[in-house]
Amino acid sequence: MNGKEKVNAWLDEHADETVEFLRELLRIPSVNPYFEDEDSLKREEKAQKYLQKYLDDMGFETELTYPDAHELIEYKDMAGYCPDHTFEERPNLYGVLRGVGEGKSLMLSGHMDVVQTGSKWTHDPFSGDLVDGKIYGRGAVDMKGGIAAMTAAVKAIKESGIKLRGDVKVGTVVDEEAGGMGTLALVAHGYRADACIITEPTHLNLAPLCRGILWGKLIIEGRAGHIELERDDWRAGGAVDAIDKAAYILDRFDEFNKDWEFTKAHKYLPIPCQLKFAQFDAGEFPTAFANRAELIFDAQYLPQDKDKNGLGGKVKKEIEDFVAGVAATDPWLKENPPRIEWILDADCGETSDTQEFFKVTKKCLEENVPHAIVEGNCAHTDMGWFCNVGIPTINLGPGDSKLAHQADEYIEVEEYIQCIKLIADIILDWCEETD
């Protein structure tokens, strides 16, 4: 048997073991503490130490490192830097399994933190329940399923007696769900490889890019007044309904988004970037016109639109200029211009389809998962920093991302095992078997 056949045979024989590995990882809560209602769950450290032992037993050289905002101050204007985040009991885990030499190295990466459980679960979110071929638990899809799959792929190669020329490296990080400072710290610590796979859930599709995400709050001022009475002209002190002014601006964003359908599209994304309003808060009393309206929006941006710091500064200005242009067409808004408070800027990244690593991964995908396609992540992942330091990086992992953050999050066992085999094949090809 060749290497791939040996690995697949081992995995077929040890499928129950690899499933139990994921279930045990799901039983260890690792909720990001910035979701306050879950702060008592001991954060990510216990899960990282469980994985560390698994790697140690395979022969990895491992270490735990704790991100520190003060030590990362030089990155304060760049992606992932969150000065108020603390990392007690929140380590990154890094490990390397040395090859025999003269081969290319590969980093396998994922985030160990998960979001809060929320309500309406019918399975214990930290049980790892296995029912009808599905494994349930918070993080099953996002993204302990991917972490378990990439780690099990290395174990299958190791247990099959195969030696590699290149090093295999594992980097599991914290804080992806609340800013991305874990990956910033991992990269700043100097960890590098010739290529990287982030095993975010892609349904086994190959995602060579992810989009950046901007959250902003659009604030529109009005002037309160009795809602049941006739209004005087605003120039004479009459009331101005902030909700009316918000609607005026919202209508203009239809034109904005139509333009973005062409200027913010990408061949590997199923939908273009758009600016969508998600929350609305206005007014103080039922009997008064709203004196202020606040609208929170989500806007996406492409890697090609990043600014010099790897963030969405250019797109922020584009949005601000558009709002200013709309305001200039309304007398009240011209004198009382709306403003935007920026809440979040999550970075993005892209690996060209001309890169050798993309071609190797695509070949393995076609051989192992013929129905899979090349399709970028519409949401944010941690790939930006790896790309920033010159590491060709792709997202490829098991599970349907639409199930992430939901009650009864689950991953299908069949797809999980299929992903392990696929990642193992990529490792064998990229890091090269010895003769």
How should these model regions be labeled?
Residues 23, 94, 165, 169-171, ...:
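Beta-strand secondary-structure signal
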Residues 2-135, 164, 400:
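Acidic/His- and Gly-rich active-site-bordering loop/insert found
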Residues 132-135, 140-255, 405-421:
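Fold-level recognition of mixed alpha/beta catalytic cores in primary-metabolism enzymes, strongest
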Residues 90, 123, 192, 211-215, ...:
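Short, solvent-exposed loop/turn segments at the edges of secondary structure
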Residues 1-13, 57, 87, 116, ...:
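Metal-dependent amide/peptide-bond hydrolase catalytic core
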Residues 63, 106-108, 171, 195-197, ...:
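Hydrophobic/aromatic beta-strand patches that form the interior of the parallel beta-sheet core
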